[in-house]
From Swiss-Prot:
Zn(2+) binds at residues 92, 110, 117. Its cofactor is Mg(2+); Zn(2+). The gene is hisI. It is found in: Cytoplasm. This is Phosphoribosyl-AMP cyclohydrolase. PANTHER family: HISTIDINE BIOSYNTHESIS BIFUNCTIONAL PROTEIN, HISTIDINE BIOSYNTHESIS BIFUNCTIONAL PROTEIN HIS7.
Length: 139
């Protein structure tokens, strides 16, 4: 049984009410956008299932669901770069989350060792599309 109430058919209650009623997709997941609480930089996009969201709320440490490994994932548990949640928001229809976090340790969030998973820019030129390193990426 879910600790989160089901969404009512009343759209206004979902969009304007005070009840947190996350809407998980058909796979039982909700998208989580993660930014650095200090400077707002986009760090990563991940997914949470109900258990990951519950653990995040209970512990204050971000937990996610790994779609590739099909397992719960406490971000930074291996590297020491745990994500302490400073603020958690939901969007208007409660089907996406925004976590503002402080990253412990030496700071990389991406498994490649970079601060952000968004280190490449999509460039379209002369009918061709390619990836280039973003000018503000971290090594």
């Amino acid at each position: 049984m879910s600790i989160f109430p089901a969404q009512p058919s009343d759209k206004k209650a979902v969009e304007e009410g005070a009840a947190f009623m996350p809407r998980f997709d058909a796979s039982g997941l909700i998208t989580a956008i993660v930014t650095d609480a200090r400077d707002g930089e986009l760090l990563m996009v991940a997914h949470m299932n109900e258990e990951a969201l519950r653990l995040t709320l209970e512990t204050g440490i971000a937990h996610y669901w790994s779609r590739s490994r099909k397992t719960l994932w406490k971000k930074g548990e291996t590297s020491g770069n745990l994500q302490s949640v400073v603020e958690l928001r939901t969007d208007c229809d409660q089907d996406a989350l925004w976590l503002k976090v402080h990253v412990a340790g030496d700071g990389p969030t991406c498994h490649t060792g970079r601060r952000s998973c968004f280190y490449r820019q999509v460039v379209s030129s002369g009918g061709k599309v390619a990836l280039t390193m973003a000018s503000d990426h971290d090594q």
